[in-house]
Amino acid sequence: MPRPAVFLDRDGVLNQEVGYIHRLEDLQLIPGVAQAVRRLNDAGWFCCLASNQSGPARDYYSIDHVHALHHRLQELLAASAGAVLDAVYFCPDLSRPEGGVVADYAGWTTWRKPNTGMLVAAAWDHDLDLSRSVMVGDKATDIDLARNAGCYGILVQTGFGDRVLEGSYQHASQPDYIAEDLAAAVEWICTHLAPR
């Protein structure tokens, strides 16, 4: 039977929002994040990264660098609290009008948020029930993705979240819940939803 998942954006949700991360050591966890992911692990949730990462399309760095950043993220989560992301999905693509310049990644794709490609692929690969899943992000596009995929959407106030709420970044959104940070989002998830 398909199970639900918690999909997590990366920058501003799991790690500090510092713009495009050119040096691995600049990827630093937001305090309390590892413990929050571990709580989801312990509660039986499938935890999945779902993140737009257009650095390769913009020619800021290679796709291998993105993989290295995700390896570091997994290492930090494990070292801090024994936490695990069960799967990692990201979109390196960006259309030319939006700034994509590297041919292999400069195009429109169903994987780029708020399109549902990453979540649909994860659901297919891991037998997930999107209607019982949650998307946690700090941008309106994360909440739009949740709506488009039929998931619950939680907006965290870390990263760009506060700016989304005040209307100074992206556009207005209607999340199912607004959380101070990932720990508060996980508290809501564990209180209101069941992983099985």
Swiss-Prot record:
GO molecular function, one term: D-glycero-beta-D-manno-heptose 1,7-bisphosphate 7-phosphatase activity
Pfam families reported for this sequence: Hydrolase_like
Record's keyword annotation contains Cytoplasm: yes
Repressor among keywords: no
Coiled-coil spans in chain: none
Reactions accelerated catalytically: D-glycero-D-manno-heptose 1,7-bisphosphate + H2O = D-glycero-D-manno-heptose 1-phosphate + phosphate
Gene Ontology process terms (BP): carbohydrate metabolic process
PANTHER family the record matches: D-GLYCERO-BETA-D-MANNO-HEPTOSE-1,7-BISPHOSPHATE 7-PHOSPHATASE
Protein name according to UniProt: D-glycero-D-manno-heptose-1,7-bisphosphate 7-phosphatase
Upper taxonomic lineage: Bacteria, Bacillati, Cyanobacteriota, Cyanophyceae, Acaryochloridales
